[in-house]
Amino acid sequence: MSEEERKQHVVLVHGACHGAWCWYKVKPQLEASGHRVTAVDLAASGIDMTRSITDISTCEQYSEPLMQLMTSLPDDEKVVLVGHSLGGLSLAMAMDMFPTKISVSVFVTAMMPDTKHSPSFVWDKLRKETSREEWLDTVFTSEKPDFPSEFWIFGPEFMAKNLYQLSPVQDLELAKMLVRANPLIKKDMAERRSFSEEGYGSVTRIFIVCGKDLVSPEDYQRSMISNFPPKEVMEIKDADHMPMFSKPQQLCALLLEIANKYA
């Protein structure tokens, strides 16, 4: 295969409360290697103002921008999907719906569901292993008691101590300015059936462990790996929960290796 034929379309999916902006260090590095890169804003995230957070109560609604992108791809095009943190659930949904359009999916310290439990299984496990005190000034709220979706937003203290503790202070300050409330859609995830073996389970998965992640600790990451083993496990030992900021060069090197090896 020629070098030109190896160039891939890489799709980057952000985690909770963030947006496409969080990939600003990664996107140009991948493009410099010749790849086409699309960073997606999920619904009511980043600079997406076309949807209101009060209108989002399901995973489909939250993931709609990613699904629209996948639908628009030609039938003969396959992408490299990369998801971070909560974005792993949107990745899984895309894999389940469009398995033939994805060459490989990369879970970057991301929630990686299995094909036996409901998608909320991985989130519920994290919440059980994390006390409310550890979330510090993160706000979990609802617009009104009978609203079916819970909103949450990371607080600045939580971001500084647990999300960005090894990242440049400039990136932490940028994030403080740009994070938005995120729909938790927990009820929908809990009621949803498991992802299928024929769809989600058929796509090659790679997991990138972040060794200094205080939000999704390494033990939690490896429990997801043991529960539903991916094709390969890679590691960035000194990355916090935000490797695109704390270790962008190492993350890009792994993504380039994955694209070359599996796409």
Swiss-Prot record:
Pathway: Plant hormone biosynthesis; Lipid metabolism; oxylipin biosynthesis. PROSITE patterns: LIPASE_SER. Methylesterase shown to have carboxylesterase activity, methyl indole-3-acetic acid (MeIAA) esterase activity and methyl jasmonate (MeJA) esterase activity in vitro. Transmembrane segments: none annotated. GO terms for molecular function: hydrolase activity, acting on ester bonds; methyl indole-3-acetate esterase activity; methyl jasmonate esterase activity. GO terms for cellular component: vacuole. This is Methylesterase 3. The keyword Cell inner membrane does not apply. InterPro entries: AB_hydrolase_1, AB_hydrolase_fold, MES/HNL. Pfam families: Abhydrolase_6. Belongs to the AB hydrolase superfamily. Methylesterase family. It comes from Arabidopsis thaliana. Keywords: Hydrolase. The keyword Hydrolase applies. It catalyses: methyl (indol-3-yl)acetate + H2O = (indol-3-yl)acetate + methanol + H(+); methyl (-)-jasmonate + H2O = jasmonate + methanol + H(+). GO terms for biological process: oxylipin biosynthetic process. The active site is at S85, D213, H241. Its EC number is 3.1.1.-.
